């Protein structure tokens, strides 16, 4: 893991003392080792440059203070980007929804090996999960439209919830039906922030 590259691109790391930086580096190195060893047996991701994925997952923290959220939900967590690493930095209690068996097994392995007590893994699609709860923060880097993502989360948010969606070049087309939102850009990434209190019933369309 090229930790120097992370420090050069993630400004918030400047606020970490040496002890916390050392602890973070150890966990990221452990993740990298497990990612490659697990990946040799199970094809869970095509990522080759993990540093790029980490920067993409965490760069939003250079622009927005997300430290006040007590709990969060992530949709389609895959190999853990972004929520696993947001949980590592923010200490927010995150529930990761990942229906793919191999990917869910990897996330559970990471949770165990890294001692991430603030991370829970659910091997199920969020819309099929019956024990609904209100999340203060909902994140996703999944490749589905913003309206569909919001619709799938019906029952998991209230007026105090903030959606953080990691989107690409087509984001403005996806957001045509949304009256209020905020976009922060870095490189080719568009970080979309939507306050649930600004949503209407028309946004709860799982088939959008």
Tell where the protein language model's regions lie, with residue ranges.
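Class I SAM-dependent transferase core
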Residues: 2-73, 102-105, 109-119
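Class I SAM-dependent methyltransferase "Motif I" SAM/SAH-binding loop
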Residues: 73-79
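Short coil/turn segments at beta-strand junctions that form active-site/ligand-binding loops
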Residues: 68-70, 92, 133-134
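Conserved SAM-binding loop of SAM-dependent methyltransferases across substrates and taxa
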Residues: 79-91
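S-adenosylmethionine
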Residues: 85, 95, 99-208
